[in-house]
Amino acid sequence: MRILYHHRTASKDGQAVHIEEMIDALRCEGHVVQVVAPGALRTTDSAPVQKSHGQMGEDMGWVHRLKAHLPKAVYELMECAYSYVAYRKLVTTARAFKPDVIYERYNLFLLSGLMAKKRLGIPLLLEVNAPLVQERLHHSGGLTLRRLATWSEGVVWRGADRVLPVTHVMADFVRGRGVPE
């Protein structure tokens, strides 16, 4: 299967380890995986094609400084606006790569996978690791645009062809938001 794997993670942390392991596991199962993410575009054998700021593992301190100096609402709108940047990358890559499926690691305010699915008619598999609206409300300094965040989370979860929660607890939460199994 040809899989277009999309994520918005730039930092080299636990998320990055999970992402790299998922991509490696998919490839070990014989799938051809093309990654679309902040920073480097990657070939199907995982070698970077080009490096740019934002590649997983690079210093992302500028993002934290930006977040600290902007009003929360502005930063959250920027997160949402990034969906357009990611959407353009996804559509361009998908047209060249011709994937069977888009596999996206869910992130708050990230609408690009759903937008690409609707534009190109490619099924969207959505990996959900956490209820990010709740997480951001209670941790990470809070959430200003709660209604927008709740809407975007719901529309992406319900718009995916399959939602892949990583735990039974997360699956119960996703079902509670009206996402069919």
Which sequence ranges carry the predicted segments?
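Glycine-rich phosphate-binding loop signature in dinucleotide/nucleotide-binding domains
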Residues: 93-98
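Structural motif
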Residues: 100-101, 162
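Short His-centered aromatic/hydrophobic patch
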Residues: 104-109, 128-129
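Membrane-proximal helix-turn-helix segments that form the acceptor-binding/catalytic region
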Residues: 84, 88-92, 115-118, 132-133, ...
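A short, charged, and often flexible helix/loop element on the N-terminal side
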Residues: 46-89, 141
